[in-house]
Amino acid sequence: MEKKYKLTDETISVNGRTLYRIEALKDFGDVKKGDKGGYVENEENLSQSGGCWVYRDAAVYGSAKVYGDAVICDKAEVCDNAVISDKATISGDAEVYGNAEVYENAEVFGHAEVFGYAKVFGYAEVSGYAEVSGNAEIHGSAEVFSKTKVYGNAEVFGYAEIYGDAEVFGHAEVFGYAEISGNAKVYDNAKVYDKAEVCGNAKVFGSAIILDSAKVYGDAQVYGNAVVYGNTIVCGSAKIYGNAVVCDDAEVYDNAVVHGEAQVYGHALVYGNMEIYGNAWVYGDAEVYDDAKVFGSAKIFGDAQVYGDTLVCDNAQIYGKAAVHDDAVVCDDAVVCDNAEVYEDAVVCGDMVICGNAVVYD
């Protein structure tokens, strides 16, 4: 096979290794015969076939291999057992090492590092000061940049973007048009996809799923088997966990907690220090806030408001424009509806129905 380049006498020392500048022996691609390239340790580093090339001050050494039409340029370094192939490009001050692979049309540039057994392929881009390591995979048209870290067995693909100081690790998957940014962390077996966003100091972990156009930010945490979707907003220091579901246009914020098998949906607002758990549902345009607790199989819906230190439990229902607040308790199979109001230390229980414009207090 006719060689396309030779090693020259011009050398540099990198990490105790002697590297040789290469010179083209024939025309190929945009390389002309006589063009000087970058540096390699030996001819095993750069294939003598295909259009692959090492440009300028880039260096390839160790047992690293570059072949196909791959390009290594600027001050990029590829070493150890790394493999760069197809039409991949490594540029800027990027480093690819360990047993990492970059192939197809992927690009690694800036000060990014890809190492371990990580793979970057498809049309994916890794840039800035991002680090991709472990067995992580970045592919599709995904972008990982800024100071992001993707590691473990994490997978980022589709058109997903990971940036800021965000971290994606464990067996987490981020895909679709999802965005993870700020100091957010997505890990364990969590999945974030579609157009969902996780940012700020938020954490999504366990087997939690965030999808559609849902947003999780602030110091919020979503974990366990919780599912958040639709146009939902979860923020502040809110926590969603267990098998809880929050969806549609619902909002959960402040220090609110939703867990167990609870569901919050519609245009419901849940905030303050309240807690919803068990099989309770809050939906419609209902609001639950302050230190209220809703549990059991209770349902709050319509335009109802529950706040203060109220307890709503068992099979109780609050709906219409009803308001229950202060230290009131609504339990058993009781119903509070229409424009009724229950407050102070009132207890509504059994099969009681408080409706119309009734007012109950103690």
Where are the regions a protein language model picked out?
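Terminal amphipathic alpha-helical/low-complexity segments used for targeting or macromolecular assembly
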Residues: 1-51, 111, 146, 248, ...
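Extracellular repeat-rich scaffold modules on cell surfaces
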Residues: 49, 60-61
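Fold-core signature of tandem repeat domains
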Residues: 54, 60, 66, 70-72, ...
